[in-house]
A protein has these predicted regions:
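N-terminal accessory segment detector
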Residues: 1-132, 193
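Beta-rich nucleic-acid/ligand-interaction surfaces
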Residues: 175-189
Length: 193
């Protein structure tokens, strides 16, 4: 439990906003979903963290916003999946593509880790794994499934985001069970094309 604001709290606040921005972008694809999202879930504060956080309960305040952002994203995604699953995945790909990423597997993972909520940092949801090439991590527990009506929908959203993010790069995201990898589609260091 923290007694004062630290950089990790700003990182969490930024992740909360990114998740909420994705929820809002998805909801805008369907006016009734956008309306229902705002009616059923309060908006997340946009003011600077130090202006809105309860400094007497930093961890609790952030945890409440994590849950709210997760619920907002799940609501928007589940509503759109029922109406137009392909359109939902295209919208998530576009959201990832807007990052205009170019870089290494390490840089891609750092970007992903700085964007998405995967519990609180102390939860250690992503654990690094040995990789011959690129980056690998194991998902130690599902912190998103409880918010979704459809099993696996969050994982599909993340896969679509990775597809958009890595569009045009030599990197490839792959998930096999709880093991995720980022590596080259072709020999990244090769001069033979």
């Amino acid at each position: 439990m923290s007694l004062f604001l630290a950089p990790i709290h700003q990182i969490m606040y930024d992740k909360i906003h990114y998740t909420d921005d994705l929820a809002t972008a998805l909801a805008k694809k369907d006016p009734s979903t956008a309306r229902a999202l705002e009616e059923n879930f309060p908006a997340i504060e946009k003011e600077p963290l130090e202006a809105v956080i309860d400094e007497g309960n930093i961890h609790g305040w952030l945890a409440e916003r994590v849950v709210l952002a997760e619920k907002r994203l799940a609501f928007a995604a589940c509503a759109l999946a029922k109406k137009d699953r392909a359109g939902l995945m295209d919208a998530v790909k576009d959201f990832g593509r807007k990052e205009a990423f170019s870089g290494s597997a390490d840089e891609a993972f750092i970007l992903y880790d700085r964007r998405f909520l995967n519990g609180m940092p102390c939860d250690r949801v992503h654990m690094p794994e040995e990789a011959k090439e690129g980056v690998a991590w194991r998902i130690t527990r599902d912190v998103h499934g409880e918010y979704y009506d459809e099993a696996g929908l969050y994982d599909a959203l993340i896969a679509a985001w990775w597809e958009g993010l890595l569009d045009g790069s030599e990197l490839n995201y792959h998930r096999d069970g709880n093991l995720c990898t980022l590596n080259c589609q072709v020999k990244c260091n090769s001069t033979e094309w």
